[in-house]
Amino acid sequence: MQDKTSHFYGDREIQALEGLPKITMEKSSTLCRETLLRVIPAIIDKDFESFAKGLTNIQNLMGEIFFNAQNGSTFSSPSVGKVVSNLAENFEIGSGQSSWGPTGFAIFKSNDELQKALTFLKKNNVLTNGLRLDVTCARNRGYQLFKSGR
């Protein structure tokens, strides 16, 4: 989901980055632990629940770090934050924000869950004007390395 009305770049971004608090050793350790001991093993084990929880924990912690720069929110866009919050309260998802946003994301275990969530969002008038939803699928295959002919 992307809020076309909220952008964070240029001088505003530079000022915000300069004003961020230092990341504490505790938060840094938590980010490493979630990544190395939860997210990566969950990917290997195809354990959606652990993957989603770890990803969301990482995103929430990063949102705390950027909280003051984002007007007291873990999301730069209140509209995106509202959608993600509603989804997280009602569905098992992995969620977060890309960089400063305004793009947020929600990862679902199945297409059926996604369809239920889309119906829920429409039925409960959670979506606002200026918010665009894009639905994509995971590649579900490993990386590929190519040797350049250069």
Ranges and model annotations:
Residues 6-71:
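Active-site rim beta-loop-alpha module in soluble metabolic enzymes
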Residues 1, 15-16, 146-150:
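C-terminal domain-closing interface element
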Residues 43-150:
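Glycine-rich, charge-dense phosphate/pyrophosphate-binding loop(s)
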Residues 1-4, 137:
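Short, structured patches in soluble enzyme cores that scaffold and shape functional sites
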Residues 2, 8-9, 83:
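Generic low-polarity alpha-helical segments
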